[in-house]
């Protein structure tokens, strides 16, 4: 199966790029890693993964620690239920290492990673 991408261009307005200070870059990086999400239920956990993207999970407790550090008060059982219902999945689709991602992300992650791995193996 081959995947084809079609690039669609649309007119865009270009804003002048401003140079960030090191402090502002640090603040923005931390803000991205610790998004402001309200709630501790399944929807909040899935939103967290939508914003963060896949997280490395070679260590079994890594997704639990990542979630609890960003959504204080989330229950262990909530995360387990998301894994049991396959809304969160652990796979090795990125660089051959184990990552946890939301099920919605898995399809495109796997397609991109599979194509990349196939190209690497052909070399």
What do the predicted segments below correspond to?
Residues 3-123:
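Phosphate-backbone binding and catalysis cores of DNA-processing enzymes
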